[in-house]
Amino acid sequence: MNALEKRSVFALASVYAMRMLGLFMVLPVFMLLGEDLQGATPALLGFAIGAYGLSQALLQIPFGMLSDRVGRKRMIYIGLVLFAAGSLLAAATDSIYVVIAGRILQGAGAIASVLMALLSDLTREEERTKAMATVGITIGLSFSVSLVLGPVLGAWWGLSGIFYTTAALAVVALVIVSRLVPTPHQHKTSADTHPAREMLGRVLSDGRLLRLDFGIFALHLVLTALFLVFPSMLQDQFGLATSSHWWFYLSVMVTSFFAMVPFIIVGEKKRRMKPVLCGAIALLTLATAGFTGVSGSLVAAWAVLFFFFMAFNLLEASLPSLISKEAPAASKGT
């Protein structure tokens, strides 16, 4: 990559990182700290955790299409402002209903597809795989860091402090886009990143893609469900204070990542990804069931979470790649 491409990739990966940190720092502590919100119930707390995904799913494609008309950076600015506004709304209230509204507003800044399209505009075709890989690694690292930072910030500043930090990260992302991201002279029409209206029906009727889409949906559903109950287990069953959760998650995420990598390497080199993925699904199922039997043993809880994230990280890294391989070349953006 040339200097301009390196700067663009670094800047856009940083924007991704800021957004991912903001969205997921709240995940490991929300069920614990959210109990003090007015009107809070377990169901409403769970909805608040996942509410951003609803608006994000609905607005992802419209944001991408609008960026073709009004410009990439303009839509990114709008998305980040919405993200910051949602964070401030959630930070400034003690009502669960307003927090839910804030989370929905956070998700409304659905700029992921626009960022990918801008990355495509600013990189040559032969360098795009490296650029996408860099962003993918950044997303994975940001998620892991968010699980460590969330409990620390929650112990220091509470739930509002996490949301205020998220708003600050959005402002930093705005500065990065303004100062470091070049403005493309023209949009490149790339099948890898640009949604096509005429391809939508074809993609939605493809059974193989639908199975993979459902796999990603189920994977993130299980992850969200885990954090509805696991933080409370650490606190109530094992007496681990919220301020101490960070080292538990850090040790699990680091070790599970290194344990997962050899399986991806073997699967790709030997062209045995299907058995590897089936094994990961089986391990994820067993680990999820294993949470019912860890009562009273922190070591057992650590081991089960280790296997859970070993399987989760493997699937998280592989399923999007499989979708890219299965999708027709003309409809990968869709």
Write out the residue ranges for each language-model feature:
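Juxtamembrane intracellular "pre-TM" segments in multi-pass secondary transporters
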Residues: M1-E5, P182-G215
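Cytoplasmic helix-loop-helix junction between adjacent transmembrane helices
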Residues: G102-G140
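Conserved MFS/SLC helix-loop-helix module at the cytosolic interface between two early adjacent transmembrane helices
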Residues: L58-D94
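C-terminal membrane-cytosol helix-exit motif in multi-pass small-molecule transporters
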Residues: A168-H187
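Short amphipathic helix-loop junctions that connect adjacent transmembrane helices
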Residues: P28-P42, L228-S244
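Cytoplasmic membrane-interface "Motif A"-like loop-to-helix N-cap segments
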Residues: R69-G79, E268-I281
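C-terminal transmembrane helical hairpin of 12-TM major facilitator-type secondary transporters
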Residues: K274-L319
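Helix-to-loop junctions at the C-terminal end of transmembrane segments
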Residues: Q60-G71, F258-R272
